[in-house]
A protein has these predicted regions:
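Conserved small/polar residues in nucleotide/adenosyl-binding loops
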Residues: 206
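Start-of-domain marker
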Residues: 1-36, 49
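Phosphate/adenylate-binding glycine loop and adjacent helical scaffold
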Residues: 115, 119, 179, 200
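Acidic/His-rich structured neighborhood in mature extracellular/periplasmic domains
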Residues: 31-146
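Alpha-helical segments in soluble extracytoplasmic regions
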Residues: 122-194
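Solvent-exposed alpha-helical segments and adjacent loops
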Residues: 86-95, 99-103, 175, 179-183, ...
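Surface-exposed peri-terminal alpha-helical interaction modules
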Residues: 7, 16-18, 57-59, 78-84, ...
Length: 206
């Protein structure tokens, strides 16, 4: 409800254009109201003129420690972060929106990726919150935000658009052209791997 009942973008989506997203929290340790957890995020968008979906994000974040009391409402204010749990959820909402909009227009998701970065900037001031610090891990939220914005990501984001919009979305109308475009787009991943061997774009497909 926290995600579904909030408007995250000014864009209007038709029913068949909506992003299918699931976030699953895996609790590893529990001490009263303190949770040591992981969160699995999966998101898919429809492929144009088909019954298929394509994966936008399939990522396991292994650093989610938070405090939560049963029945406590989740709340988010863009100017203030009060919970590591809500901050993490909001961060991935913006990452998903960024990847979705990138798949429809070249770097079309920049605004949302920048909003995800803003969450990182704010969360870093909370010393007890895990998953936000630079150099703690090459697969945490800081790493995801950085990977989507550094110079090496340009090739990835261009590939992302070409693969989805000019490739998959063309398959119904012209399968040969769509397939050729997809094959031609994939070498860009090697560019990212060469420039940033430990990038989360390689490890976690963020």
């Amino acid at each position: 409800e926290f995600v579904n009942n909030r408007k995250w973008t000014d864009a209007t989506f038709a029913v068949n254009e909506k992003i299918d997203c699931t976030m699953t929290i895996i609790v590893n340790e529990l001490d009263e109201t303190n949770f040591k957890s992981e969160i699995q995020i999966q998101a898919r968008r429809p492929v144009y003129n088909s019954s298929y979906t394509t994966t936008l994000l399939n990522f396991r974040d292994q650093q989610l420690d938070f405090e939560y009391t049963e029945g406590e409402p989740l709340d988010y204010n863009s100017n203030t972060l009060t919970s590591n749990l809500t901050a993490t959820i909001v961060f991935y909402v913006y990452v998903i929106l960024g990847l979705d909009f990138d798949s429809f227009a070249p770097k079309g998701g920049t605004t949302y990726i920048q909003q995800a970065q803003q969450i990182v900037n704010m969360a870093q001031s909370e010393m007890s919150w895990t998953g936000w610090k630079a150099f703690d891990s090459n697969q945490n939220r800081h790493a995801v935000a950085t990977a989507l914005q550094d110079n090496a990501s340009d090739a990835f984001r261009e590939m992302w658009y070409t693969y989805h919009r000019k490739g998959l979305d063309e398959m119904a109308a012209n399968p040969d052209r769509g397939r050729t475009t997809i094959i031609g787009a994939l070498p860009a991943l090697q560019e990212v791997k060469k420039a940033r061997p430990t990038s989360v774009l390689q490890i976690g497909r963020a």
